[in-house]
């Protein structure tokens, strides 16, 4: 009887922690993958002190590694893509991140974003969409960078 009680108590303590810990799998270094399956850039996703998540381009893997974001607008216009924060203001929503935006440096456009960790593959499913509900947009699969 004591054993069953201990198992039950442990389940109530550990189960919520497992749910809360899911977005932490998203933190780390990820390769963005183009439509042909090639690596385009290395993005570092981190959690900020205010609880939001962001993604910064650490390295460009194709073309000129020092190129500028010529198609961007505002403060990002003609700034180096390397070092640019392309994912902003993402918040935990269960086992995924939502509510923020993602910048596509190729066209300078900013899209609504959601990010989900795929437990079966270990990949990230990144969706950029025109609408906040994510109905009109496209998906990318990002691969974890191994040191």
Predicted regions and their residues:
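Beta-strand residues in well-ordered beta-sheet regions across diverse protein folds
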Residues: 56, 125-127
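Edge beta-strand at a domain terminus
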Residues: 121-123, 130-147
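Bacterial Sec-dependent N-terminal signal peptides
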Residues: 1-24
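Central antiparallel beta-sheet cores of small beta-barrel/beta-sandwich binding domains
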Residues: 32-35, 39-113
